[in-house]
């Protein structure tokens, strides 16, 4: 790594000026953009590249080279002195249509469509925080599909969304409504029991726009009445779900805190384990054998315990979080040391969307290097999504999704909480300090 000193204020001011001048370029030059910077993280090799020059044509990267290379005629230039470029970040576990300030029973005061609007606002915050792709693993009323469609049509601003729609769950489980009495409880569309019901539910969610299937294999923290580690689907049910999803070309994420549920989910063939709090050495070995990824939300314990009570989180949930938060971090450390494949997943929505990058510091504190944490949110995440042709690295053929920080994220990974530059598909989204 170069010992070049950084000047954040000057660099950010310079970004703003240069981007404004670029915005005045002729429309005819907008199809090709050339971006230069002080350095770039090559997440595929783990190297730092000095003075990169990236050419983006029609939204995709067409060349990656060194500054001074030939620039296409009529190209629009974006020069970022003092800036470190990274690929757009990927969060593998978001809930865009959630707001932690309205937790527990407080959520019930709003109309269903209120949460669609919340999701639109959160999508913009998430993109401006440097997350150009998210996997949204649970959203009512197919809201994440609606927001994805609105983003793709240019109606609203947000990241690329891989939507799960509803999370599938067993009656009385973490993905069911467990806080209301029978007289007012409303059946959830993705509650399913037994192999055939589960298969039919997978088909229904795909019909209405799901691009990944998420199900609850064990209890959880923020549900009111279940035990956090208790298994809620047996191996036969899990295998039926996974087989159906894979047959339809969809990958599968499982919410699983408990040990037995994690192991059965891996045996059933899931692609990612969400939370993985109580995974043991046997689970690590199974994950390595099957190529299963862990997506562990190890920052949000801080937020839940600090803010949860005043936000309306159930007393029972706070007790569960106190019992499992530290253990999950210890499991993360052990799983990483054991060589389990890891992706970056935050559970944003449990804490505010837009603050997703807070988790990088926690991942480094619990055993990863800054580069490993960044790779979890870029190259690894793209591989787990099955979208390495499109996202996850600054490489020819992939989308022109770039972010820039004015510090050195390998020296201080907290720099990723203050992204100064965001580009999605070759279009500048943000070019100023937070």
Give a label for each model feature.
Residues 40, 45-86:
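Histidine-rich, glycine-flanked metal-binding segment
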Residues 83-155, 171-174, 178-181, 236, ...:
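Metal-associated gating/positioning segment near the N- to mid-region
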Residues 118-144, 158-167, 210-223, 251, ...:
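Divalent metal-dependent hydrolysis catalytic cores, especially in the metallo-beta-lactamase
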Residues 98-115, 124, 171-186, 221-235, ...:
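Active-site gating loops and adjacent loop-to-helix segments of metal-dependent hydrolytic enzymes
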Residues 149, 153-167, 229-254, 295-296:
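Alpha-helix-loop-beta-strand connector modules within alpha/beta enzyme cores
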Residues 100-103, 144, 223-225, 262-268, ...:
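Histidine/acidic-residue-rich catalytic or RNA/ligand-binding cores of hydrolases
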Residues 11-25:
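Bacterial N-terminal signal peptides
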Residues 109, 247, 251, 316, ...:
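His/Asp/Glu-enriched, well-ordered alpha-helical/loop segment
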